[in-house]
Amino acid sequence: MSDIKIEEKPDGLEGPGFFATSLDSVIGLARKNSLWPLPFATSCCGIEFMATMASTYDIARFGAERPSFSPRQADVLLVMGTIAKKMGPVLRHVYEQMAEPKWVVAVGACASSGGIFDTYSVLQGIDRIIPVDVYVPGCPPRPEQIIQGLMRVQDLASTESLRRRESPEYKALLAKYEIEE
């Protein structure tokens, strides 16, 4: 048949009011429902983000009730709009100030690929200077799309191992962007 072995639950952790789980699962659940976004908005997508934060869409339902305007307190960097090459070092500095774990969302066509601005002065995607976890398409994306992007970050936050940030793969990713810990 199959040589797959199903892990048995540990003894002594059953009964009313008890459950058996891993520390990764508990911390993932807490991270998933307590994301603090840092908006880095420069263009039209920033307007759509303001609509997303309004009462019509109620982003608080998704655990992102409190936007942070300090990188040291933020979990999710939402980059929205056109990023000029002169702004690149500022964006990277903001990213480096964020504490681990951190996630980056490129909201809209301009942040993802430069959008319609294919010029020498516009960064053709923020993934050239910082690692991006989620891309939200659109010009500008609708609030529903931004919420869907945040829900994707929630999925990443809930399933990410506590040890992933210490893995050789993650360190290689940071080295690719020349980011020191």
From Swiss-Prot:
Per the UniProt entry, the signal peptide is none
Entry EC number(s): 7.1.1.-
The record's Gene Ontology cellular component field reads: plasma membrane; respiratory chain complex I
Q: Which Pfam families match?
A: Oxidored_q6
Under the heading Gene3D superfamilies, the entry gives: 3.40.50.12280
Transferase as a keyword of this entry, yes or no, is no
Select a single GO molecular function from the record's annotations and give it: iron ion binding
Source species: Cytophaga hutchinsonii (strain ATCC 33406 / DSM 1761 / CIP 103989 / NBRC 15051 / NCIMB 9469 / D465)
Name the coenzymes or cofactors required: [4Fe-4S] cluster
Instruction: From the Swiss-Prot or TrEMBL record, give the protein name.
Output: NADH-quinone oxidoreductase subunit B 2
Cofactor binding annotation: Binds 1 [4Fe-4S] cluster.
Specify the protein's topology with respect to the membrane: Peripheral membrane protein
Q: What functional role does this protein have? A: NDH-1 shuttles electrons from NADH, via FMN and iron-sulfur (Fe-S) centers, to quinones in the respiratory chain. The immediate electron acceptor for the enzyme in this species is believed to be a menaquinone. Couples the redox reaction to proton translocation (for every two electrons transferred, four hydrogen ions are translocated across the cytoplasmic membrane), and thus conserves the redox energy in a proton gradient.
